[in-house]
UniProtKB/Swiss-Prot annotation:
Transmembrane segment boundaries: none
Lineage: Bacteria, Bacillati, Mycoplasmatota, Mycoplasmoidales, Mycoplasmoidaceae
Protein name as annotated: Phenylalanine--tRNA ligase alpha subunit
EC number: 6.1.1.20
Cofactor: Mg(2+)
GO molecular function: ATP binding; magnesium ion binding; phenylalanine-tRNA ligase activity; tRNA binding
Underlying gene: pheS
Pfam families for this protein: tRNA-synt_2d
Enzyme class: ligase
UniProt record, GO biological process: phenylalanyl-tRNA aminoacylation
Positions bound to Mg(2+): 254
Catalytic activity reported: tRNA(Phe) + L-phenylalanine + ATP = L-phenylalanyl-tRNA(Phe) + AMP + diphosphate + H(+)
Length: 341
């Protein structure tokens, strides 16, 4: 019969002489083969069930003790090894400085404007960049022969759908599908990418970002539109920003205006304002009665709406003095890191 105490003492002496972890593992395998493997052979050749059971329990007990000894000596060896080794890292060296991230200049402009519209309880609406010809053109009163409908100006997907050319299509859809009442107060902002079939240059891009809003309510007038736009411009550009409303024409508003701000770089004209002393920033107007009807708004004698469309890149270029729209999309890290929140 095997003397367990004598065998374990032998194993301990053998493990104590090991010089490294590899030797410990190899030694465990050697001891198993020399001392426990013969026991397995006895189990196989035993003829009595009671003998097999007794030998099996003995083997299991010894195998567990051998494994526990290996684990114990490995821990001791690792602790001693850690104490004797010098740290591979000098913890007194200064840490690597992390670069703080910040929003892209376009998103800083968007956040500024969204903050303004939220203060007036507008719903911020994001929708698919794919729209129908009906929402993009027909319901917005845009004539069949208008140049924006041409395939040379827009990106058509099929005969009924295209990539939206303005966010007004998205705003119209939001208003059209909203719950209607006899006394509506609908405030919607649409925001996202729009697409025009333009050649990319310093001031044009086939894709850019637009913000569009509609406010529909009884009694809204041109005075409300002017106040709201002027207030938004002051919020964005700061006090003492002078504005000018010029009559224009958009199929979906009547009357229609283009809004300019006074050039802050010059007194008598410069290359930025093209010698006019004014810089165009957005288009706005009173929503056309036919468009109101198309959106399901009745009683256009009393219920009116104000609206505007704003190019985000244009505002960012003016605010930050950027002269090439392509800079926003070129992933130039030096350019992007100039704009910290």
């Amino acid at each position: 019969m095997i003397d367990q105490n004598k065998l374990i003492t032998k194993w301990k002496k053998a493990f104590a002489k090991a010089k490294n972890l590899t030797t410990l593992v190899n030694l465990k395998n050697t001891l198993h083969n020399s001392d426990l493997k013969p026991l397995l052979q006895k189990i196989k050749t035993a003829t009595k069930l009671s003998e097999k059971s007794s030998l099996g329990k003995l083997y299991q007990s010894l195998d567990i003790q051998l494994t526990d000894l290996l684990t114990s000596y490995k821990k001791t060896f690792e602790i001693n090894n850690q104490v004797s080794q010098k740290p591979s890292l000098d913890v007194m060296l200064p840490a690597t400085e992390f670069t703080n991230g910040s929003n892209n200049a376009l998103y800083q402009v968007i956040d500024n404007l969204v903050e303004y519209f939220k203060s007036f309880l507008f719903t911020i609406n994001f929708d698919s960049e794919l729209t129908s010809i009906s929402d993009c053109f027909d319901l917005l009163n845009i004539p069949k022969d208008h140049s924006s409908r041409n395939e040379s100006d827009s990106f058509y997907i099929d005969k009924t759908s295209l990539l939206r050319t303005h966010c007004t299509a998205t705003t119209l859809k939001a208003v059209r599908t909203s719950k209607k009442t006899n006394n509506p107060d609908i405030r919607v902002v649409s925001l996202g990418a729009v697409f025009r079939n333009d050649s990319d240059d310093a001031t044009h891009s086939h894709q850019f970002t637009q913000l569009d809003f509609m406010w529909i309510k009884k009694g809204l007038s041109l005075a409300n539109l002017k106040w709201f736009i002027n207030n938004m411009i002051t919020h964005f550009f700061g006090e003492n920003t002078f504005t000018r409303f010029r009559l224009s024409h958009f199929p979906f508003t009547e009357p229609s205006f283009e809004i300019d701000i006074r050039c802050w770089l010059c007194q008598n004209g410069c290359s930025i304002c093209k010698q006019t002393k004014w810089i165009e920033i957005l288009g706005a107007g009173i929503i056309h009665p036919q468009v109101m009807n198309n959106m399901g708004i009745g009683d256009t004698e009393n219920i009116t709406g104000i609206a505007a469309g704003i190019g985000i890149e244009r505002l960012a270029m003016l605010k930050y003095g950027i002269d090439d729209i392509r800079d926003f999309y070129d992933n130039n890290f030096k350019f992007l890191t100039q704009f910290t929140d």
